[in-house]
Design a protein with these regions (language model features):
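N-terminal secretory signal peptides that target proteins for export/translocation
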Residues: 1-5
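Hydrophobic membrane-insertion alpha-helices, especially the h-region
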Residues: 10-24
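Cleft-lining beta-strand/loop regions that shape enzyme active-site pockets
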Residues: 23-35, 39, 43-51, 55-56, ...
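Extended, small/polar residue-biased N-terminal targeting/export presequences
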Residues: 50-111, 154-184, 518-525, 536-542
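Conserved functional hotspot residues or short segments at active or partner-binding sites
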Residues: 343-344, 348-349, 354-542
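Polar, glycine-rich mid-to-C-terminal structural blocks
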Residues: 290, 302, 309, 313-374, ...
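Short linear motifs in exposed loops
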Residues: 112, 141, 171, 332, ...
């Protein structure tokens, strides 16, 4: 009976996926029905006649993963359990202990603490390894760790953690505090206001509005809105933030799709808080989605000068769709477009090279015009008016973080040399050299198509005992290692900043990172200089 249910579920699920993934053929119902019938028969014949016993659910999961891999990474399937866990996390009754954790070397490690939250007050420290939650052991194979940690506000959770090979169990109250979207705002020298926005969570626009009101009361004559490292969030919050600086009924962003019902326009609905304060928006390669909507709209409307590095380029819109048995698919339904008509999406997942890599949209970037007639370009995210970025072949920064090289090095440094004063803190070149040496001594991938193909060639050559091929691949591998060294030198400043931020966060929380940036940061200093020269500021917007 169970097997029949599994098979029925598998067929229904596959049918729905086929309909969804054949979106460009929605009017060709015969073709859709034909493909569903073929898949149904294929799936049935395999499960009924294959020489070995098959697992319908596993076969279906493999098929689903392969199908979705042909689309984009944002179109994802969620099982019934995944959906229920997500609902629980979004519930107002579900709160945590105020810490970020991730598995490092198969150990659940505390990577960040929120100031004043229960984990922080209870003595947990960055780098501690969590072994048990309410007596349940956790390891790299554990799923739903956040569900174990979370619960109703003020409920108690028992945590067993290890520090310096010493195990300790403590009880923490789930306090429900959430990190602010605006961790810092301040009036700087020369009456320049500064607002850091880390996410577009619910209420983010109210936090920005409140900060702006304080700064205007203090007679701020210019404003820096820092969206660096902001991954995005709720679209309406982005629209409401832009509304603080532009008139009512102004188009901020639109979505366009092959399906008419997904074509929408988002316009401002309120009177602005400040129409004329000189405004600068800071972005970098980790500013994405809603961050790019804010930066792009203010740039298109010539309301702000954008400074920093080219943004991430995430301009795709997703919407969840229910599936049978409580499952769900979050599917890309449309693209974001800024007021000038440009799309900020960097990668075109419908266009792939022969090697299988995704082509960049900016290869065919079109020119668009701002309100004042300035040239701006579509594809590849938001290009700053003042570009402080360095041209790089690889996303080395992302790779260093992904492999936990930055966190592990910063933790070791923090334990040996705890930062006591932000004003006196500065990493020397010797620290960079040691970090580079440590990283290069480890085997890590630049995640290029070339490297992936070389690895496959090396493995195949070993299996077939082709010594000459193995030697040739080794030569290519040496060349790639030299490329890594070149990238380290090229990105030295960015890497030192990244290490500094991680070390400071361990001593002074996320708020300290922004405090330190105000002391000596290239992007902020560039913004302050520009706001001190309003003639040049105005010229950049013409």
């Amino acid at each position: 009976m169970k097997n029949k249910i599994k098979k029925r579920f598998a067929f229904i699920l596959l049918s729905l996926f086929i309909v969804l993934t054949l979106g460009s053929f929605k009017t060709d119902f015969f073709e859709i029905a034909k493909q569903i019938e073929i898949y149904n028969s294929l799936f049935k014949e395999i499960n009924m006649n294959y020489v070995d016993e098959t697992n319908p659910a596993e076969l279906m999961e493999t098929g689903v993963k392969k199908m979705l891999s042909e689309l984009d990474p944002y179109t994802v399937y969620s099982s019934e359990q995944d959906v229920e866990d997500a609902k629980m996390r979004r519930s107002g009754d579900f709160v945590g202990i105020g810490a970020n954790l991730r598995f490092i070397n198969e150990a659940l490690t505390v990577t960040e603490l929120y100031k004043g939250c229960s984990a922080d007050n209870g003595g947990i420290r960055t780098g501690d390894v969590i072994r048990k939650i309410n007596g349940i052991s956790v390891d790299n194979s554990s799923s739903g760790v956040d569900v174990l940690l979370g619960g109703k506000k003020n409920s108690v959770v028992d945590i067993t953690y290890v520090r310096n090979n010493v195990s300790k169990t403590i009880s923490l109250s789930r306090d429900g505090r959430k990190e602010k979207a605006v961790p810092l705002f301040r009036l700087l020298e020369n009456d320049i206001g500064y607002i850091a926005l880390t996410r577009f969570s619910r209420g983010a626009a109210r936090e920005v509005e409140s900060a702006l009101k304080f700064l205007l009361i203090d007679e701020a004559k210019g404003l820096i809105l820092d969206l660096r490292n902001n991954p995005g969030g709720l679209l309406q919050e982005a629209v409401n933030i832009v509304n603080l600086f532009v008139p009512k009924n102004q188009l901020i962003v639109s979505t366009q799709s092959n399906i008419k019902k997904y074509n929408t326009r988002f316009v401002t609905k309120q009177q602005p808080l400040s129409l004329d304060i000189p405004l600068i928006v800071l972005v970098n390669e980790r500013s994405a989605s809603a961050s790019e909507i804010v930066a792009g709209a203010l740039q298109d409307l010539d309301r702000a000068v954008v400074i920093g590095k080219q943004s991430f380029g995430k301009g795709l819109v997703q919407q969840p769709k229910p599936l049978p048995y409580g499952a769900q698919i979050k599917i890309t339904i449309s693209r974001y477009f800024t007021p000038s008509g440009r799309c900020i999406q960097a990668l075109d997942y419908s266009r792939k090279t022969k090697s299988g890599s995704v082509k960049s949209v900016e290869d065919n970037a079109d020119v668009f015009k701002t309100k004042n007639g300035r040239d701006v370009f579509g594809g590849g995210g938001i290009m700053p008016d003042i570009n402080l970025g360095v041209s790089s072949k690889f996303d080395l920064i992302k790779i260093l973080k992904k492999n936990n090289f930055v966190f592990n090095f910063a933790l070791a440094y923090h334990e040996r040399n705890p930062v006591k004063n932000l004003k006196d803190f500065s990493l020397k070149e010797s620290v960079f050299n040691q970090f580079k040496k440590d990283c290069l001594s480890k085997s890590f991938s630049l995640e290029t198509t070339t490297e992936n193909l070389l690895l496959k060639a090396y493995v195949a050559a070993e299996e077939e005992n082709l010594s000459s091929i193995i030697e040739s691949v080794a030569v290519f591998n040496d060349a790639l290692n030299k490329e890594k060294e070149v990238e380290f030198v090229l990105l030295k400043s960015e890497i030192l900043t990244l290490l500094s931020e991680e070390i400071i966060k361990m001593a002074f929380y996320n708020e300290g990172v922004y405090e330190y940036a105000l002391l000596n940061n290239k992007a902020i200093n560039t913004a302050k200089i520009l706001l001190g020269d309003l003639g040049r500021y105005a010229a950049l917007l013409k």
